[in-house]
Amino acid sequence: QHFFKVYVPGVGTPFMQVGDSGVGKDALLGNATARYGERRILWALAQALNCVYRYLTRSGKGPGLFSAEEVMRFCEDFSLGKEELLEASNGAAEKRQRDNKNRRTLEVMLNKLHDSIRPHMIDPETGQCSKVDPGRVQRIFVSAFGFSRGAAEARVFVNWFLAMCQIDAELRGQTGPT
């Protein structure tokens, strides 16, 4: 109940939660271009937030805060595709617009978590939580593993996770990752 494991299948393999059949064109493009890699990383970020939610609400392996359908909507809102990369090379304004959209997607995810666990969060005025059972989360340890392309995906996940933690800190009016 204090440890959570999440497995994300590698690109080019079946992963229906993100719309990857792992066969035919999906397998070919997954192996050649890491198709749906971004979706896998966003799914993993949602699962990290689901783990916090499950711990604090004692829902164990039950349904998390984010459904598969909701994660797919986040994937549609988040964009690092070819068009965005080409736009980014044309100027900083387009890159900022894309980055802001991606940041808003992460903010939506974090705000939903905040709303669902508010009694467990520290009140900035009192410095206390109104609900301390099952306990106060002071640290979260994350291990990300992968081999070859999976290692690259694991590194990107860790970088996005740290960015999400920084956004979380900013949303909470703090200076560092929370």
Regions found by a protein language model. Name each.
Residues 1-178:
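Active-site- or binding-pocket-proximal scaffold segments within functional domains
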